[in-house]
């Protein structure tokens, strides 16, 4: 069974947009504009920017991966769904970091979610490589997870 790439892209683009929207809706606007309220507000803006960059990076990689294909296999579609499921959890942990900036659990949870999203993206890449002439660069699959694992380890060290 084959699925039209434009349908897969349309669905995925909608999910990516909803994820960023949910993250921005999690930002609490300050009730007063003194430093006690503005510092947490700017922290939430910072977390929103970081999370949006992660989502935007995955969106770019996703659109680039599917570029040039008219149809994809059902295995690619399933890997794509898992990819979106993991990314859909990103707003939850982003909000956790916004609400509890000194706690380690939301930070580690976010790192694990990004690792799982990257693993599912890698699976999607490999399913496409299995029926196309494109090669999969292993080096691109090593850099992201290593940097995320290092970031998670630094979260343990910093507490």
Regions found by a protein language model. Name each.
Residues 1-159:
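Multi-pass alpha-helical transmembrane bundle typical of ion/small-solute transporters
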């Amino acid at each position: 069974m084959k699925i039209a790439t434009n349908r897969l892209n349309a669905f995925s683009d909608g999910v990516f947009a909803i994820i960023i929207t949910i993250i921005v809706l999690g930002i609490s606007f300050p009730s007063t504009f003194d430093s006690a309220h503005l510092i947490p507000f700017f922290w939430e803006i910072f977390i929103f920017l970081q999370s949006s960059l992660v989502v935007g990076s995955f969106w770019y990689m996703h659109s680039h991966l599917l570029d040039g294909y008219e149809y994809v296999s059902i295995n690619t579609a399933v890997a794509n769904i898992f990819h979106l499921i993991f990314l859909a959890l990103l707003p939850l942990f982003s909000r956790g970091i916004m609400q509890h900036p000194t706690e380690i659990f939301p930070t580690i949870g976010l790192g694990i979610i990004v690792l799982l999203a990257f693993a599912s993206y890698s699976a999607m890449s490999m399913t496409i490589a299995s029926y196309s002439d494109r090669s999969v660069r292993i080096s691109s699959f090593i850099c992201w997870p290593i940097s995320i694992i290092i970031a998670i380890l630094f979260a343990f060290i910093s507490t």
